[in-house]
Design a protein with these regions (language model features):
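A generic structural signal for short hydrophobic patches within well-formed alpha-helices
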Residues: 11-12, 45, 120-121
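Helix-loop "lid/cap" segments that line or gate small-molecule binding pockets
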Residues: 48-54, 72
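Anion (oxyanion) recognition and catalysis
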Residues: 32, 69, 107
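Acidic, PIN/NYN-like endoribonuclease modules and their adjacent C-terminal/linker elements
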Residues: 1-3, 103-133
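Active-site neighborhoods of divalent-metal-dependent phosphate/nucleic-acid chemistry enzymes
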Residues: 74-112
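Short, well-structured N-terminal submotif of metal-dependent ribonuclease cores
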Residues: 1-40, 53-66
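Histidine- and aromatic-rich ligand-binding microenvironments
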Residues: 6-7, 40-42, 94-96, 117, ...
């Protein structure tokens, strides 16, 4: 199982039961069985929260947060080193700062980035992307 980094798109699709969330569910199940967590930045966590609260409401977020605790996801803070790489991405690519942190973490970990967000096409030559549909 390759090392994987989740973008906000992936986790939101998972929580909303969207078709793109099915491979995320499978990935999380494999990660749990292998005792090998997937990775996500705290910046992406914040993006997931505000997007769910904004569109689906605070109660939906509270339920999602309870589920999130049990998922095999290791959250990474925005260290200075990670911020440097994220800033380099953000200076060149028109995507959110949280997306820049996801790309930076994937680069740092030499991991695949799991996303369906087309804005990442701009960096697919620099990092491996597992495209969700």
């Amino acid at each position: 199982m390759p090392t994987s980094v989740l973008d906000s798109f992936a986790l939101i699709a998972y929580f909303r039961g969207e078709p793109a969330g099915a491979p995320v569910k499978e990935l999380l199940q494999k990660a749990s069985k292998a005792d090998k967590p997937v990775h996500m930045t705290e910046a992406n966590y914040a993006e997931v929260k505000y997007m769910i609260v904004r569109k689906d409401g605070a109660e939906t977020w509270r339920e999602a947060a309870k589920i999130l605790i049990a998922l095999p996801i290791e959250f990474h803070p925005a260290t200075r080193e990670l911020a440097e790489v994220a800033a380099d991405f953000k200076s060149r690519v028109s995507f959110s700062l949280a997306d820049a942190f996801a790309a930076a973490l994937a680069k740092e970990k030499k991991a695949e980035l799991v996303t369906g967000d087309p804005e990442f096409k701009a960096v697919e030559k620099e990092i491996k992307i597992n495209w969700l549909k």
